[in-house]
Amino acid sequence: ELINKGKAYVDSQTSLEIADQKGTPTKPGSESPYRDRPVEESLELFLKMKNGDFKQGEHVLRAKISMSSSNMLMRDPVIYRVINSPHPRTKNTWKIYPMYDWTHGESDYIEQVSHSLCTLEFKPHRDLYDWFLDQVVDKSKIRPNQREFARLNLSHTITSKRKLLSLVEGGFVSG
């Protein structure tokens, strides 16, 4: 859908070339030579990425946002990349995988999470979270909101999701 709307494109550069184009916090980035690739060509390449026709790193799907944004995360971020390794659960079903910044908002939206609570290091990611949601949101559904907070460390209390899950799975607590 994003490719059809002209809001994403398949980039065929190396990860090093993409990184070099990002610019710096004080200098805008430069556009990929593939940024204006025809929609039909990007759709065809993306289908081939999904089918496993390419090696890891040959192509990525990037959002088409702005290479001059003051927020470097908004400079045409990678959304999907090819990974040619079996997944622990789905094995070889999938050949492409989404990047965290895309998946974060998308999964919150699908699961109808109203508020995504994140620690402060995610504050720069909020613009991207909101941009992604703007592309997929259905006005009749809940639109998630990302909110950041300072990390809270409590003494003698477990708050880590991983540690809590381990306690539940180990049968030490229920929940």
Show where each model-derived region lies.
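Active-site cores that bind ATP or allylic diphosphates and position pyrophosphate for catalysis
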Residues: E1-Q146, N153-T159
